[in-house]
From Swiss-Prot:
It comes from Hahella chejuensis (strain KCTC 2396). SMART domains: AdoHcyase (SM00996), AdoHcyase_NAD (SM00997). This is Adenosylhomocysteinase. HAMAP family: AdoHcyase (MF_00563). It catalyses: S-adenosyl-L-homocysteine + H2O = L-homocysteine + adenosine. Its cofactor is NAD(+). Binds 1 NAD(+) per subunit.
Length: 463
């Protein structure tokens, strides 16, 4: 357990209120007890100091759970500088506790867009000069993009990037395809212990929590439309169904759509015959006019466009649980309709105030579970952040930046961690639940063609 220290002689941070540090520390202590995989890694590798010499730039939601991640990285030898990857997701008491522990952190809930970029750049620089960072831990890809575009000289010294989320992985793969990615990256998002836990089970827990905190609405008996049925969509649909909502799914992928059907959801489209004509008359007004709640979950752009927003039932709640705020056309809403703040991250959007024709928009179209609530529980984030620690160790050990220049191109990649590491995280999580895993006998292992200690499934196995 890290101790609070005097910050009188430490000013390398900016948080909302440093006096919240004691509260944050109490919650961090509780979270540690709910993160068995991360804490097991901390104790297993503490003596070895595998991250000694690592200087990590971190840009991920500055929550209580992230504080446990940060202190695990520090316990394994790393230095870190931190910012949040979303203007609304910081928990101010968590940021204060990390600052009070002597870790440079620049994050507060309710940043402006300009402040958000400023915070990222404060992690990149120290005393006005680029910090001698050699590792990156990112969520969404904004830090990675700023480094490549504005601080390219720093990439000569960086061994790799570990990326947390679907959106960030898409950006990395796009950079790789275009020849723009200058350092290797580990795709943490597609580790099973991240994608199934965080994306699916985490959203199952946190979406309904956020909507109820924001609106105080009863959800049972009302109609919901979930846009997307990937892992985030699956968890989101389950979250609303367990509240008693009547849930329908919109999908572009026939495999995901088939899964939705098999899970008992009706697959529909917000467009007539599923075709987006780019015009108001192409919208399925009958569907949208009876929808009480619309949730976007895709990581794609404009999946709830202006024509859908115009057609939605008056009083409908609109929110997003994908990474960025461009899934819902909030620009159109700002340019054309009157906004009235009810409380932080809850706005009434008047399409016609005289007629009280309105929508309820949560978190301004950004991540609703972190804007209107506290995100996923510690036990969920345990798997994600254990993978982040292993990814940082994996990349730091391989020392990409120290390779001869002619060897670097063939060592660029975006890849997931080896399956055995994924299984290691899962094992620690099961042990944290008090579960007992059965061990294969040697004849059994031979029969199915695996080692007794794993890995147990081929890399292309679909869990």
């Amino acid at each position: 357990m890290a101790q609070l220290q005097s910050v009188d002689n430490f000013s390398d941070y900016k948080v909302k209120d440093i006096s919240l540090a004691a509260w944050g520390r109490k919650e961090i202590d509780i979270a540690e007890g709910e993160m068995p995989a991360l804490m097991t890694l901390r104790e297993k590798y503490r003596a070895q100091q595998p991250l000694a010499g690592a200087r990590i730039l971190g840009c991920i939601h500055m929550t209580i759970q992230t504080a446990v991640l940060i202190e695990t990285l520090v316990a394994l030898g790393a230095e870190v500088r931190w910012s949040s990857c979303n203007i609304f997701s910081t928990q101010d008491h968590a940021a204060a506790a990390i600052a009070a522990a002597g870790v440079p952190v620049f994050a507060w809930k309710g940043e402006t867009e300009e402040e958000y970029v400023w915070c990222i750049k404060q992690t990149i620089t120290k005393d006005g000069q680029p910090w001698n960072a050699n590792m990156v831990l990112d969520d969404g890809g904004d830090l990675t993009e700023i480094l490549h575009n504005e601080f390219p000289q720093m990439l000569d010294h960086i061994h790799g990037i570990s990326e947390e989320t679907t959106t960030g992985v898409h950006r990395l793969l796009d950079m790789m395809k275009k020849g723009e990615l200058k350092v290797p990256a580990v795709n943490v998002n597609d580790s099973v212990t991240k994608s199934k836990n965080d994306n699916k089970y985490g959203c199952r827990h946190s979406l309904n929590d956020a909507i109820k905190r924001a609106t105080d609405h009863l959800l049972a008996g009302k109609k919901a439309l979930v846009i997307g049925y990937g892992d985030v969509g699956k968890g989101s649909a389950a979250s609303l169904r367990q509240e008693g909502m009547i849930v329908k799914i919109s999908e572009i992928d026939p495999i995901c759509a088939m899964q939705a059907c098999m899970d008992g959801y009706e697959v529909v489209s917000p467009y007539i015959d599923g075709v987006n004509t780019g015009a108001a008359d192409g919208v399925n007004r009958d569907l949208l006019g009876h929808t009480d709640l619309l949730v976007t979950t895709t990581g794609n752009v404009n999946v709830c466009d202006k024509y859908m927003l115009q057609a939605l039932k008056s009083g409908a709640v609109v929110c997003n649980i994908g990474h960025f705020d461009n899934e819902i056309d909030t620009r159109f809403m700002r340019d054309n309709w009157e906004w009235e703040e009810v409380k932080p991250q809850v706005h009434v959007i008047y399409r016609n105030k005289d007629q009280n024709d309105h929508l309820l928009l949560l978190s301004e179209g950004r991540l609703v579970n972190l804007g209107n609530a506290t995100g996923h529980p510690s036990r969920i984030m345990d798997g994600s952040f254990a993978n982040q620690v292993l990814a940082q160790m994996y990349l730091f050990e391989r020392k990409f930046a120290d390779l001869p220049a002619d060897e670097k191109p063939k060592n660029l990649y975006v890849r997931v961690l080896p399956k055995q590491l994924d299984e290691e995280v899962a094992r620690y999580m099961v042990q944290g639940f008090g579960g007992v895993i059965t061990k294969l006998t040697q004849p059994q292992a031979k029969y199915i063609g695996v080692e007794v200690e794993g890995p147990y499934k081929p890399t292309d196995y679909k869990y």
